[in-house]
UniProtKB/Swiss-Prot annotation:
The gene is aroD. GO terms for biological process: 3,4-dihydroxybenzoate biosynthetic process; amino acid biosynthetic process; aromatic amino acid family biosynthetic process; chorismate biosynthetic process. This is 3-dehydroquinate dehydratase. CDD domains: DHQase_I. It comes from the Bacteria.
Length: 252
């Protein structure tokens, strides 16, 4: 399986990489949060742009991106607008969503974008091609905050992302039972062993699914999300605790 390299970070080998989400509402809080995050132990900075209030002002959005880039120049920056239908803060039209991601790609400030699988097949394919033409990697994602589908469906979604040339397919699902967590882990393992030719990221959410955030190296998930301050999804644990556990499992 090929790895994905962003800056000096190699994703898809060794212990899962730690992603943290920054969720600031304005320029001032982007600055203060960035300074606080700079001291934390993580690998990839995800900027959750759907939390930003002034989204209609693309110049303001890119000014905030510039602050993040300048504050943490060595960290890969993942630009993520999470749609309301997949658990984000604000609803957005498909056209505005694509335009915002293209503006981020054009800016030269971001290393990766998050692109939701169910945005629309044509829009997804075109945006992936546009990102790759500008040397920006694509994390293609799907989130269900209500349920966990069957393993076959989980694998089908990850394979579809791979067929759309996502650099890193990602899926996050809500378990209704402990067996749902096993379904996610079994699907991850089957995908990793039989179909994946690139790194994938999977997780089962909430307290029930915490084990999936820790056991990525065992089952085949290349990255996991931790919390510096406020968790961006249910079940995230602090980056310090997360790094400790990932290191223990890696060295075992």
């Amino acid at each position: 399986m090929k790895t994905v390299t962003v800056k000096d970070l190699v994703i898809g080998t060794g212990a899962p990489k730690i992603i943290v989400s920054l969720m600031a509402k304005d320029i001032a809080s982007v600055k203060s949060e960035a300074l606080a995050y700079r001291e934390a132990d993580f690998d990839i900075l995800e900027w959750r742009v759907d939390h930003y209030a002034d989204l209609s002002n693309v110049e303001s959005v890119m000014a905030a991106a510039k602050i993040l880039r300048e504050t943490m120049p060595e960290k890969p920056l993942l630009f993520t607008y999470r749609s309301a239908k997949e658990g984000g803060e604000q609803a957005i039209s498909t056209e505005a969503y694509i335009a915002l991601n293209r503006a981020a790609i054009d800016s030269g400030l971001v290393d990766m974008i998050d692109l939701e699988l169910f945005t629309g097949d044509d829009q997804v394919k075109e945006t992936v091609a546009y990102a790759h033409a500008h040397d920006v990697k694509v994390v293609m994602s799907n989130h269900d905050f209500h349920k966990t589908p069957e393993a076959e469906e989980i694998i089908a979604r990850l394979r579809k992302m791979q067929s759309f040339d996502a650099d890193i397919p990602k899926i996050a699902l809500m378990p209704q039972s402990t067996s749902d967590v096993l379904t996610l882990l079994a699907a991850t393992l089957e995908m990793q062993e039989q179909y994946a030719d690139r790194p994938i990221i999977t997780m089962s959410m909430a307290k029930t699914g915490v084990i999936s955030r820790l056991a990525g190296e065992v089952f085949g998930s290349a990255a996991t999300f931790g919390a510096v301050k406020k968790a961006s999804a249910p079940g995230q644990i602090s980056v310090n605790d997360l790094r400790t556990v990932l290191t223990i499992l890696h060295q075992a």
